[in-house]
Amino acid sequence: TFNAQYAWDKIDRINKKRYNKRKRLVNIGYIISGVAATLLLVLGFSKMGVFDKQPEMLVRMTADYGSRSEVVLPDGSVVKLNSGSDITYSYNAKEKIREVNFQGEGFFDVSKNKIPFVIKMNNGLRLKVHGTSFNLQAYTDEKTVEASLVEGCIELDHGNEKLLMNAGDMAVFDKQTNRMRPVSGVLSHSYSWLEDKLYMDHMPLASVCKYLERRYDVTIHLQKDLG
């Protein structure tokens, strides 16, 4: 005998199987299209240089009170930091950034390069070099900034005022007047701290005590009539 219900159920199962197969094919098509679109986006961004841009990393190196340190910058320049100093720079794996923020005292041995090496200080003073060695004293709590050039040529820059220095020159920038001027003195005395020596050429007693506080991480109290 012919079973009509059984026949309809069989036809229904066949139709469902065909529909599901077609649906899977459509879904696979969507997935392939999505992958292709993603690849196109990646290629597009790559051509635009989006993935070529490396994130910059801010690096800060310090020499605490009672210590000293040596820093080798990404461009090969070497900075010896005196006690109570710090230097901050941006690091990028693909770009040689020759710009630093500095406070304290340091002896810079800057590698030669067409790109200028720029030192920024918090009072707006800038020092620009291409390849040279010099001592820079720029403590935040001091009234002056002192630069002593051993080799090469450097330029001090503050607003519209500039001072070009040659080997053997020494200069002072007054933070209160925002003026800079050449000074005379014994050049080697400015970086004698590298050998743990201190020359107190006309140095006030308060400045001597401040130097000793940084160097040995101690606190010195002066009587008012001695300061």
Which sequence ranges carry the predicted segments?
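A residue-level detector for the "anchor" residue at the start of short, highly conserved motifs
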Residues: 7, 11, 15-227
